[in-house]
Design a protein with these regions (language model features):
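N-terminal Lys/Arg-rich, disordered targeting/topogenic segments
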Residues: 1-3
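Sequence signature of WD/YWTD-type beta-propeller architectures
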Residues: 6-15, 19-330
């Protein structure tokens, strides 16, 4: 009897070892197959005191500092040659961009000048009260200018453009609900907006994804019930939307009006945070944040990458407790 138990245990251990080795091999092959992709970029203040903006190599899982400035809420340009972000430090407050070739920083517009702009459209000014989390969110390149959420609750999407040395501003969308993320399709001036949907009956909030034309009242709900903590993403051609509805990650096809299952991510005292597609839309990078005990600290970040065609998944990194991330893009 004892020998039988030992034999069964040995077989089970052997099966588990083989399964683990298989998963490692599949993950290695998947990461090896990711070619011609820009690096992941993120801004962070590490527990050890180091801070700034970094680029992350998926294949060797190493990171390199590219700026001493923390580019909060950062995002790539369409050609991946620059990133735009919010600088929220004593030495500068406002929008800035970073050249991804030589890593030079160029201020775009200061908070002081932004406040002058928003006065023209009757939005409340934002005051700088020291380094921390900015109230200027999700800056992006759009046409020959820039867009962003204005204010803590991110209800207004603004578009600014400099012409003859003067900044012009236009409100593209303004609602009563907090905005999570947005995408703009230039040709049709179409807005894809992830926002909150309050459920009065159970007093919780979930997200919805809507589509509308700027300056028109033609709002359509594309996806109902998304996770309120995670951010949607779209590929460069804006034909699909990737989103998380616990515990599953889906890809919604705008052309067929159907959703496809990609993978599952079960959360235990965690939140799904960033979802970022590769430039070709084949791979999905996402982050899961461990919730600190009694919210005594920041999320402990975990990096994952999944093949949207096969569902194969790799855990790239588990960062240290106390590392605070301010923005990620791929």
């Amino acid at each position: 009897m004892r020998r039988t138990i030992i034999k069964v245990c040995a077989i089970l251990i052997g099966i588990l070892c083989m399964f683990y080795m298989y998963k490692v091999y599949v993950g290695y092959q998947m990461v090896k197959g990711i070619v011609d992709q820009p690096p992941i970029v993120f801004s962070v203040r590490f527990k050890n005191g180091d801070r700034g903006t970094f680029k992350y190599n998926i294949k060797n899982r190493k990171y390199e500092k590219i700026s001493d400035y923390i580019f909060q809420e950062l995002s790539y340009s369409d050609d991946y040659e620059k990133i735009i972000g919010v600088i929220w430090e004593d030495r500068f407050q406002g929008l800035a961009e970073l050249d991804m070739e030589d890593y030079t920083l160029r201020p775009i517009i200061s908070l002081k000048d932004l406040n002058k702009c928003v006065k023209e459209v009757n939005l409340k000014e934002i005051e700088y009260d020291g380094p921390g989390v900015t109230q200027l969110r999700m800056p992006k390149y759009y046409k020959d200018g820039y867009t962003f959420f204005w204010g803590y609750y991110s209800t207004a999407i603004c578009y600014i453009r400099e012409e003859d040395g003067k900044w012009n501003i236009r409100i593209l969308n303004n609602t009563d609900s907090t905005g999570h993320n947005y995408f703009l399709k230039e040709e049709q001036e179409t807005l894809f907006l992830e926002t909150e949907k309050p459920f009065v009956e159970n007093k919780t909030e979930t997200g919805i994804i809507i589509k509308k034309t700027i300056d028109k009242d033609d709002e359509i709900v594309l996806v109902d019930v998304t996770d309120e903590n995670s951010f949607i993403d779209m590929p460069d051609d804006m034909t699909k939307i990737v989103y998380y509805s616990e515990p599953k990650i889906y890809m919604y096809n705008l052309e067929t009006d159907k959703k496809n299952y990609i993978s599952s991510q079960f959360l235990i005292w965690q939140h799904m945070l960033y979802l970022k597609l590769s430039s070709d839309g084949r791979y999905l990078f996402y982050t899961v944040g461990d919730i600190p005990f009694f919210w005594s600290d920041y999320y402990r970040m975990n990096f994952f990458i999944v093949d949207t065609k096969t569902g194969n998944k790799v855990n790239l990194n588990r960062w240290e407790k106390g590392d605070r991330f301010y923005g990620i893009d791929w």
